[in-house]
């Protein structure tokens, strides 16, 4: 049985680590300006936006949030002139162009190396312009916080003389796994990638098997999307190594976890990296932060949940990216029918199968295209979460106290232990 946990972010360490504030208090000078830059995926935007809003509310600093124009348009589709900046009274949102402003990009429609090369080139140029514009307008950025797949941000920050810090939006255990992979374990793991039960013992981490590792580390296709993303991770860790060598001190990394859960993992790389666990926001706060790339379903799913008994509903969602095969959909439909439990199932419009039509019409179930996951998990009627076990979903279900049936191996292992 999960309990609701909230551990407040260590804001004082973050502000001091950016070499901005000399104050010993939590409050930052209003002239302190943080720029959050994130990759245009829902799973990246959510934790970055949560932390950005927490920075703004707890430190008094100025905060700007930036992602690509395409994602920005979808976040603010109901506003006029959605390509322009937007201020919600707390944060200013300013987009940058990645060269694909008018396209609903999917990695299946373009060679991954070609896409990331285009993304890097255009984004570097336009983020640099954004930084110049902010400085010219009297709002110079004092620190940049960036998420995964954006290693090029460090170059831009350096050119402008601005300190930058990585916000690792996954688990500390996953960070430790990647760290050790790039520091002596790559050949071993690659050599045994086809042996799921092969034991892997990273320094300071609990024993693992190949099956527990992120799939990016065990995929053997040299030119696929996994290899391209792994190259981006490799660059991130090279940057951290470079910071350590140049400054003769440990680089700082913000990690989306809390000390009490991942004490062992955080200690496993503490000699090389100063990890600052920024915790997870309470459901009351997370509920109020919206930056959705998808339009919320018009079905009144919250009202539907209100009609169900406490802890009776099975909530099913596999994230905003995954696409299920017909056979997988059939298995889930069969399981739902046999469970005789009310269910709320999130299925993308372009992933619907004919089998769903029958089950969607039943009184005990509802199928939606998109919903506010935190609102659903916080509802008294939800008793179980069937999930792909992305880190955001893992933390949200933990905070809301909802048990879950999980998929991603390493996150699932963390939940079990």
Q: Where are the language model's segments positioned?
A:
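Glycosyltransferase specificity loop/lid
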Residues: 2-417
């Amino acid at each position: 049985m999960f309990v609701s946990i909230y551990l407040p972010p260590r804001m004082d360490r973050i502000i001091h680590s950016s070499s901005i504030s000399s104050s010993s208090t939590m409050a930052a000078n209003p002239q302190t300006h943080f720029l959050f830059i994130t990759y245009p995926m829902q799973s990246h935007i959510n934790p970055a936006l949560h932390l950005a809003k927490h920075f703004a509310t707890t430190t008094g600093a100025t905060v700007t949030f930036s992602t690509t124009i395409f994602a920005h348009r979808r976040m603010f589709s109901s506003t006029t002139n959605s390509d322009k900046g937007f201020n919600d009274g707390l944060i200013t949102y300013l987009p940058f162009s990645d060269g694909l402003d008018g396209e609903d990009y999917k990695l299946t429609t373009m060679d991954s190396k070609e896409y990331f090369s285009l993304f890097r080139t255009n984004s570097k140029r336009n983020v640099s312009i954004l930084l110049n514009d902010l400085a010219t307008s009297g709002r110079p950025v004092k620190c940049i916080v960036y998420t995964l797949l954006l290693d090029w941000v460090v170059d831009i920050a350096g050119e402008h003389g601005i300190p930058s810090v990585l916000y690792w939006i996954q688990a500390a255990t996953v960070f430790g796994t990647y760290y050790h992979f790039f520091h002596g374990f790559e050949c071993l793991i690659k050599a045994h990638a086809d042996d799921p039960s092969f034991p892997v013992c990273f320094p300071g981490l609990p024993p693992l098997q190949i099956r527990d590792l992120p799939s990016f580390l065990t995929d053997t296709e040299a030119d696929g999307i996994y290899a391209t993303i792994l190259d981006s991770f490799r660059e991130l860790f090279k940057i951290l190594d470079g910071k350590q060598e140049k400054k003769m001190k440990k680089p700082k990394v913000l990690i989306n976890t809390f000390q009490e859960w991942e004490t062992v993992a955080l200690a496993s790389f503490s000699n090389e990296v100063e990890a600052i666990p920024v915790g997870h926001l309470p459901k009351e706060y997370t509920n109020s932060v919206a930056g959705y790339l998808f339009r919320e379903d018009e079905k009144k799913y919250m009202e539907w949940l209100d009609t169900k008994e406490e802890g009776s509903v099975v909530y099913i969602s596999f994230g905003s990216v995954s696409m299920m095969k017909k056979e997988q959909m059939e298995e889930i439909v069969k399981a739902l029918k046999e469970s005789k439990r009310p269910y709320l199932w999130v299925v993308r419009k372009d992933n619907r199968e004919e089998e769903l039509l029958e089950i969607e019409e039943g009184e005990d179930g509802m199928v939606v295209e998109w919903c506010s996951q935190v609102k659903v998990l916080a509802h008294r009627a939800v008793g179980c979460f069937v999930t792909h076990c992305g880190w955001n979903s893992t933390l949200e279900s933990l905070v809301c106290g909802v048990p879950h049936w999980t998929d991603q191996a390493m996150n699932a292992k963390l939940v079990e232990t």
